Amino acid sequence: MEIILLERIEKLGGIGDVVTVKNGFARNYLLPNNKALRANEANRKLFEANRAKIEADNAERRSEAEGRAKDIDGKQIVLIRQASNTGQLYGSVSVRDIVDALAEDGVTGVTKSMVELERPIKSLGLVDVKVKLHPEVVVTVGVNVARSPDEAEMQSQGIDVIAAMFEEEQAEAAAAALEPDSEEEFEAATPPSELAAEASDEDADDAKEA
């Protein structure tokens, strides 16, 4: 289907461009969201008659978005979730979760359609998510998914929590392996000369008691 764009659409074009798109994309997204018009003769004339106003309105919305971008770009939100020791979440973080977290942090006016998340987040860590405030104004928000505020703080400092935990477990296991677990292991680790000396001392003590 041939359409006239009413705003900039990534990979398609800018205001006033006439482009061809798949019928489903036009009918299900572009046309109902007032992002384009069918490129028939009547709509071409209508667009040209209103081009100045359309461009002025777009410039106003872009300016407003640029003002908001200063307060949002680079912001980091923290989402506390339960996860396994391998870092896999028991569930996932969705676009709705991100929008709600931004709202709780005082960022209003961000809708689900503005958040560009290819797939739900299913593991701990930091993820950069793009938020399209306007077709020409895109900001980045850091999503910090952790099991606790302390872990979130560590991740914000660039520490890989899962790797750090794994290293700690390895160190504990190595330390435990060096400690004798029984008297037999202790004796096995004790030089024969020391064991003989201990035995002599015990014999001497027994003789005194006798």
From Swiss-Prot:
GO terms for molecular function: rRNA binding; structural constituent of ribosome. It comes from the Bacteria. SUPFAM superfamilies: L9 N-domain-like, Ribosomal protein L9 C-domain. Transmembrane segments: none annotated. Keywords: Ribonucleoprotein, Ribosomal protein, RNA-binding, rRNA-binding. Gene3D superfamilies: Ribosomal protein L9, C-terminal domain, Ribosomal protein L9, N-terminal domain. The keyword Amino-acid biosynthesis does not apply. Residues 199-210 have a biased composition (Acidic residues). The keyword Disulfide bond does not apply. Pfam families: Ribosomal_L9_C, Ribosomal_L9_N. One of its GO terms (cellular component) is ribosome. Residues 172-210 are annotated as: Disordered. One of its GO terms (biological process) is translation. Binds to the 23S rRNA. Belongs to the bacterial ribosomal protein bL9 family. This is Large ribosomal subunit protein bL9. It comes from Sphingopyxis alaskensis (strain DSM 13593 / LMG 18877 / RB2256) (Sphingomonas alaskensis).
